[in-house]
Every structure is written in structure tokens, then in C-alpha cells.
From Swiss-Prot:
Gene designation: brat1
Keyword Cell cycle: no
The name this protein goes by in its record: Integrator complex assembly factor BRAT1
Domain of life: Eukaryota
Purpose of the protein: Component of a multiprotein complex required for the assembly of the RNA endonuclease module of the integrator complex. Associates with ints9 and ints11 in the cytoplasm and blocks the active site of ints11 to inhibit the endonuclease activity of ints11 before formation of the full integrator complex. Following dissociation of wdr73 of the complex, brat1 facilitates the nuclear import of the ints9-ints11 heterodimer. In the nucleus, ints4 is integrated to the ints9-ints11 heterodimer and brat1 is released from the mature RNA endonuclease module by inositol hexakisphosphate (InsP6).
Any single Gene Ontology cellular-component annotation: cytoplasm
Entry comment, domain topic: The BRAT1-like motif mediates inhibition of the endonuclease activity of INTS11 by forming hyrogen bond and hydrophobic interactions with the active site of INTS11: Cys-821 coordinates one of the two active site zinc ions of INTS11.
Organism, scientific name: Danio rerio
Gene3D superfamilies: Leucine-rich Repeat Variant
InterPro entries in the record: ARM-like (IPR011989), ARM-type_fold (IPR016024), BRAT1 (IPR038904)
Amino acid sequence: MDGDCSSLLPAVCLVLADPKQTPPDDTSLEKLLDWFKDLHSQSNGQVLLEHQPCLLEFISSVCASKATDPAILSFTLKLTGLLAASKQDFHLLEEGGHLVCVFEREAWSVCDLWEDASVRSGWIQGLLNMLKHQQALDFICRQGLIKVILQLQNDRSLFVACLANQLLVQILKLLTPSDVTSGSDAVVSSKSSSSLDWVSVSSEITNAVVEALSSENHPQVLQGVQLLSLVLSQCEEPIRSSLWKDVLPPLEVLINRGSEPLTQPLMTVLRAAVMTPLLGQSEYKVEEFLEVMLGTGNRKEGILCATLIVKLEKCPKVLKRKAMDIILLPLQCVSTQSQDEKEVDLVLKEPLSQKALCISLLVQSLSSLAELAHKEYFEGVCIPSVTSRVVQLLRVCSGHCTSSLLHVSACTHLIGSCKIQRCGLDTLGALSVYEDNLDLRKDIFGVLLDYLKSPDSHATVLKKTFQAVLRWIGVCASFPDLLQFISNDLFPVLEKRMCDVRWEVRDSTLEFITQLTVALSDNSGFVEVLYTSGLVSILLSLLSDTEGYVRASAVTAVGEAVTSSVQQMALVSKINLLEEALAQMMIILSQDTEGFPRRAVVKTFTSWLKGSNPITALDSSLSSVLSLGGNDFDWEVKMHTLELAEALMEKMLTCCPYAVQSFSSSERTRLTQSLSKLKDLGLFDVLLNGLFDCDRPVCEKSCQLLLKLKRLNAEKADFDHDALVLKACGNRWGDEVQSRFLNKQQVKASEHVLIGGGEGTEKDLHCIKEIPLSVILQILDLDDMQRMLKLSSDHVVNSPRSLMEDILSAAQQSEENIVDCY
């Protein structure tokens, strides 16, 4: 604790303990607690209460007062527990009787303070904070606080009840294996009285869980189930198996009862159980419970349970197969022909006849299939059959429903259902990982093309369709008929979608074209098809779209089109594309009123610059891009401009890495030429302007790049520094640098006079019009600036000292207001 905080703390404690004072807001109290947590973690064995006795006085004062505000009492409870987390401070608090005083619930009940939920939650959090060692657990046992905690487990405040569960789990975690056996009946391994207390505690908690699970009161059952889940996931053996064995009878009753409101909580219990050694031991019935859950509750929960089972590593294959059948069942029902009626489960007939239930079941089935689309999860399943059913379902949703389908009534519910269409498309895309499906590619591309062509397709459905098409094109890239499909079928549809009246569709189409171009950039045939299709001219026209998002996506798409043509050495014949693209992008960067398109332009230039194939036509535009981007009012545009500057530095200074080293004569010449070119491009002005920008991320990035330059300009680099002279006047950074430069000159001049060197020359103190870059980098304390920039913006405002000063200031203002009233 620093000296300022140490001197302020006693006064703060007096203010907080004074019931006449209005307590600080909850946020301030929580920040104060966070500070104490930091002190505790950095204590290095020091006893905080010995150095700050005012804390003991504060705790005593709050305990003695009958008019304490609930917020202050809650704070005191948490603080006491936090202090008691240290063994030394725990002994001091216990010897002084403070622990009993603070955590004695009866005292707060008399004052009706216990009725406030914040006091009850503070009481639990205080115990949670303290429960870091066995002495704390021993204190809880001796004081009989377990009963209170178990009562709070059923508190009317859900927050308090959840905290009580967490506290009970923490208590069980502190019961070491030497204290409790793995059997149902605990056996004491030590004859100490404290061990006896701990064993009785574990039995008391176990009995409470059994009682809760056996209760007819739903909230009580729910809390018992939640505690069981926490114990299974957080506690070790033998506590875990001991508790499971005791709760097995009531848990079995609950699972067999099939209560729908409890299906999800019970699934959480089983999900935790399967992650433990309980799975695979028949006496614990975990697998048996999973099988029961497959057939109980609603079908949606059954599919969730089935998904969990399929993903289990240690699970009987028979159970996994049954689970997979349950997942596939809804899909199988709606896509089965009437002559195959025997194949389907007629239990689903009623749910499928109701629109809401039908859609819900299919969504869950499809989502599970998409999640499980990995080879090890689909063992023994005919993948092409599943894929065909998904294709059939997507056709039904788009209105192609044949009378031969078994559940024609269910099919009518699905026509135009965006939920089913989106889930079906996700599933179809996920199934692309299976080579067995490649023979179905014509059917798959056929249904996807139908969705792209359909005027009824929702914008979100089209986006999902594009994603699925991209995945299937990725796995079918080696097939010779793919380019024919793209040229004859896909591109004509894309042309129409690029002119769609809905801007979301135009945007999604452009994103798809960008991704497709990246995916097939190595395919010379695709690049040729792209340029002969007429899509490129539409891309260029969309650079002036009315919607900013679309313009931004068009910029990215054009950028990738140029990149792909350069990679295939096709730009020579398409030089007009680059010229027109550059012209329109410069207009966007200089005139567009929305930030997204301007950001996209700078990012595209950076992408071009980083490309493996140089685009010499960019050189004439780089200076303008740096100037416009560096002076943009959008901070993200400035950040992207700095990334462009970094790419330029990397590209032009590759022969001279950012490290202090000795250079040969030819290397020095190349370095000087490269730095001179960067200066001519205005890169140094961008970095220096960014250093004094109002947006901190921009300052940080500029500082980082200038530090690289500073290391490069170190004395050992030994090149002509005078060749890099920057104009200080007329630049935003000039005033700041000149001010620092002249201050240093004045200091030197005054020192010169003091040692008798004559009068300082007045001309040295005049406004400097030009300053060498090396001098600028020396003037600026970049290391210190970087350190300050890395601090959070609120490191001063939210410091402990500032917080305590605010508390004292508010208290003083309150007293002055009282005096004014008189």
C-alpha cells in the first residue's frame, strides 16, 4: 500500500462507519473491495491488519451499530471475509471476536437487516472470500453456519440461492480425501474433533440434497439438482461418488417421472456425470439414465440428450446408435415416401402435424446434425442417405412438395419457413466434409441454385445459401465440370443478385464473390471466366452504390479481383480495370461520407502492397492514400492507414531489419534511399501526426512504428541523417516538436551562460522550419510515451487514491450542506 492510500484509509473508514453519512454507491464500494483483493494478492506474507488497525476499528464499529446501512454492512461482510482469507489476519480477527460478531446472523435479524437481500448475499460472499484454508472451514463448522447456508439455498432471491450453492460446493471441495471415504457412510480417518465436524458437514449437505430431490416443491428440487451439477463438475473423489450414491434413489425417481420442466436441469446433471469416472460403472446407472432421458420429456430435449450421447467417447455403441436414430427421426419422417411408412416412428405423427412443434423438432434435429458433422460421430450412418434427406427437406421448404411424401400435412408447415431453410443450409454445408457425398454434387448444387434463383428467398436465407455453395465449391474444386457450373449457372444468378433491390442481398453477394475469388485465386480458368462474365463491370458500378456497406464490400471484391488477375499475370490485358478501380477508390477515400467504404479502400491498398506480386501502378497513389487516410476524421481509417504505413516500412526496409547493427556501404545507400522515398510519400508526417492524435489506439500504433524507426536510426546504423530533414512548419505535429526542441535549446543556452561561455545565440531559439528526423526521434521521449499510452484511460480516475478522495469529498460536501440548512 502506497503512502497516500495508507494516510487516507483511516479517514475513509470513519466515513463509512458513520451511519449519518450517505453511503457511497455500490460501484465505489466494489472498486474499494477490488483494491483490497489486489493488496491481499500482493501482500507477500505481510499482515494487513497489523499495518492498518483502522480496519479492525471499522469492523467493530459497524458490528456495534444498529443503524448501519445495508450497503455498508454488505461491504463489511465481504471485506471481513477477504481479510480472513489470510491465515495471519484470520487469527487476528478470530482472537478479537470479530469473526463471530460479523457472521452471527441473529444479530442482523434483530435489526431486520437480514431481510435485505444485499446483506444475505454479502454474508455468503464474505464466507466465500474467507474459505481459502481449513481454519475457515473449521470456523464455519463450529459456529453451526451450515444450517444457515442450507436455508439460503432456497432463498427467495435467486442470486442469494446461487451463491449459497457455490459456497456449499466450496465447503465440499475443502473436505480432503483423508477426511471422507468413498462410501455412502463416512468413516473418520482422524480422531480429531475437527475431522468429526467435517464428516458431519458432508453428511448434512448430502442429506439436504437428498431431501431437496425428494421434495414436491419444484424450486427446492431445482436448487438440489443445480447443487448436484456443481458438485459433479467441480469436486473431486471421493466426495463426488459418495454424493452420487446417496442421491441415486431420488434422482432415479425424477428421471423416470419425465417431468418436462426438469428435463434440461437433469440433462445438465448427466452432462456433468458423463465427464467423470462415474460413467462406465454400472452401479452408478449413468448410461441407464441417459437411455431413459432419450425417451422421456419432449422430443426436442430428447434430441439434445442424443447429441450429448453421440459425442461421448466412452459410451456403448448400441446407445450411440439409438441416439443417432433419435436425431435423424424428425428429418426421416418428413422426407419419407408413403410406401416406406414402416421405417418411421409414428409417435412423431402428432407433433409433426402441429406447425410450431414440427419446426422446433426439425430445427433441433438439423442443428444437431450440423454440430456432429465429423466422421467419428457418424459411424455406421449412411451419409449419402442423410444428405439426400436434407436436400429433400430444402426442396419441400421451397414449395416442391410431392404427394408421395408420408407426412404431407407436415410439409405444408415447412413451406417458406426461414428457420428450417437456414438450419438446413447450415447442415448441408457441414455435410460437405464427407467424400461419400461428392456423387450427389449435382443434386446439391441444384437445390442451392434454386434458392439463389428464387424471388421468395429471404436475405438471411440467401446468405446461408452462399455459405453452403462456397463450402461445396471448395470440396469440388478438382472436378472439371465445376467451372462450367460457375460460368453457366452461378454467375448469371450472381449478376441478378448484385442488382437486387435489397441492399443486404447485394452486400451478401459481394461478400460471396470476394470469398469465391480468394478460394479459387490459383485457378487460372476461374480468373478468365470471372473477367469474361461481365461481373467485373457490375463490381465497379457498385463502388458508387447508395448504401455504404455495399460500397465497402464492392471495394473489397474489386481488390480481390485485381489481386487474382495479378497472380495469374492477367493484369496486362486488364489494365483498364486497375486504372478505373484506383480512380474510383481515390474518390471514395476523399469524398465518401461514410467510414466503412473509406476503411475498405485503405485496407485494400494494404492488401495489394502485401501481395507477393508487385503492382507498380500503386506507386503514384500511395502518397495520396497516406495523406487522406492519415487526416481522416474516422479513427479506424487512421488505424488502417498506419497499417499501410507499416506494410510500406516492411516492404522498403527489408534489407535493413529493425535492429541496431553495422551496415556495409551499399546497405547504407539502400537504407538512405528507402527512407528518403518514405519521406517523399509523407509516411513520417502520418506517423508524427498520429503520435499526437486524440484517439489513443492511433497514438499507440504511431508510437510503436516510430520506435522501430528510432532503433533503425541508432548511431550504429551510421548513414546520412542530414538527408532526412522534415518540415516542421505547416504540419500538425510541428508545434509540439518545435516546442520540445526549443525547450531543449533554451536549457543548453542557459547552461552555456552559467559556465561563462558567453551569451546564447538568439537565432538558435527562433522558430525551426526544418528538423532532421534523427533529431525529432531524439527529442520525443517515445519509450515514456509508449508506457503512458499502454496504461488504461482511467488509471488515474479510478486509482485507489482517487476513489478514497472522492469518498471523503462527498462526505465533506454532505456536512457542508447540513450546515447550510441551519
